[in-house]
Amino acid sequence: MAAAKLEDADALIDSVETFIFDCDGVIWKGDKLIDDGVPETLDLLRSKGKRLVFLTNNSTRSRKQYGSKFRTLGLTVDEEEIFSSSFAAAAYLQSIHFPKDKKVYVIGEEGIINELELAGFQCLGGPSDADKKIELTPGFYMEHDKDVGAVVVGFDRYFNYYKVQYGTLCIRENPGCLFIATSRDTVFQLNGVQEWAGGGSMVGAILGSTKQEPVVVGKPSTFMMDYIAKKFGITTSQICMVGDMLDTDILFGQNGGCKTLLVLSGVTSHEMLQSHNNSIHPDLYTNQISDLLAVKAATV
Ligand SMILES: [Mg+2]
């Protein structure tokens, strides 16, 4: 069924208890708010007693680091309301009781290492492998740690062949080693100027050399939906998922049984939404989240 344009913001707000917002392309683009109405929109929803949750597939930062980004942008958000795919990787390993004497090899940035260490896991790789190079000289043999029991792969601006080879050796040679992806995002708005290759490109490299499918912990996997619903004791039918990407945010909301609202302020254009090639249809769409303020204007 084709998505309907958001006309009655009041009815939407009244029909749900919790809003889960994606961040890139919804709340901000790079280091700027999507529009000046964002703080007022969040304030309005809070004043109506709505629970707000922020969920990003971007794993470069930890929850704590995202907390300071929200504050820098002038938004009052509690760190407990923020969930990132870096946190999801740690929460997933905890949920399966990943042994604390095993290690995790990280292809990704600081956020993943921070969250894993905060959860008490031993990590290798991450930013410390950023400058490593491999010289394929005759007879060169690369050692790897046999205690690595999981390889976590996320978006990584310092991706290199050393990391690919290290992760590949762990997955192929350590019995039972897990392959975990924080997300498989195609592209995202890193700096607000153009689209940049997302975490899916790093995950694809490891998939290519191991022929293994990863466990995805970020959107559209329902792992974080189940986690958030359980943590706050909410029913997913009482949630509205708000995002700018069809194959991550909207699919995540639909997989979880939520209402879905697509905003056109990020990577998805109106043409892409209406295209015959698109099979993912949100319940509603609108230009930007501050359109939810229409309710306020209408009642004045
Ligand atoms: Mg987004």
Regions found by a protein language model. Give the residues of each.
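Asp-based, Mg2+/Mn2+-dependent phosphohydrolase catalytic module
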Residues: 1-23, 28-50, 59-80, 90-300
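Conserved glycine-rich Rossmann-like NAD(P)H-binding loop of the short-chain dehydrogenase/reductase
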Residues: 53
